[in-house]
Amino acid sequence: MIRHFIRATAVSSILLLIVACSTTQKTTTTSTQKVTGSVMKEFRAAWIATVANINWPSKPGLSTEEQKREAIELLDFLQKHHFNAAILQVRPQCDALYKSDLEPWSYYLTGKQGQAPSPYYDPLEFWVEEAHNRGIELHVWLNPYRAHHKDGKEISE
């Protein structure tokens, strides 16, 4: 009787082992890996809106020097507060805050659509240079569909 019990237990154990090893279910294991090296860089950015003079320039028609001073003030603030990127709106309403052969100069920059800053400078070029001097990436923000904003005054022909 004991022999029969031992034999039955041995056969059952072998069958159980065979069945357990032949399962069709996939098993997943979770492992934790130690992360070494550098951490991915954070994108700490600020949007700088130009439509309706929301952030820059503070109003249309400022002198070139006033526009530059305000831009430097914003970039210094971002640098002081550890931002590493700025997103500058350069095409607020079918116009441009940079030299363009396709779009007129922005009303929000000079107070008259189509009028270049005087004395002349390219605001986008200025922003890129000043941002990079502070270790800040500059990204452009284009509004491809806004034809006109209610604060944009008259549209040039």
How would you describe each model-predicted region?
Residues K26-R44, A49:
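Post-signal peptide N-terminal segment of mature Sec-exported envelope proteins
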Residues M40-F43, A49-R69, E129, N133, ...:
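Active-site-adjacent "subsite" loops/lids of carbohydrate-active enzymes
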Residues N53-E65, W105-Y121:
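The substrate-binding groove and active-site-proximal loops of carbohydrate-active enzymes
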